[in-house]
Amino acid sequence: GCGDINAACKSDCDCCGNSVTCDCYFTDCKCRESAIRKQF
């Protein structure tokens, strides 16, 4: 999940859902499609 690496962003990433990955840029949480999702 998003909080595995970017723990500080976990609360922000919760809105991303299971189909995206979270990247943390300072205080902003960016969401992107996960590699697993793109396989389908």
From Swiss-Prot:
Principal location listed in the UniProt entry: secreted
Subcellular location: Secreted
GO molecular function: sodium channel regulator activity; toxin activity
Protein purpose: Insecticidal neurotoxin that reversibly inhibits the N-methyl-D-aspartate (NMDA)-subtype of ionotropic glutamate receptor (GRIN) and inhibits inactivation of insect sodium channels (Nav). In vivo, is highly toxic to insects.
Protein name, as recorded: U12-ctenitoxin-Co1a
UniProt entry tagged with the keyword Flavoprotein: no
Disulfide bonds: C2-C16, C9-C22, C15-C31, C24-C29
UniProt record similarity statement: Belongs to the neurotoxin 03 (Tx2) family. 05 subfamily.
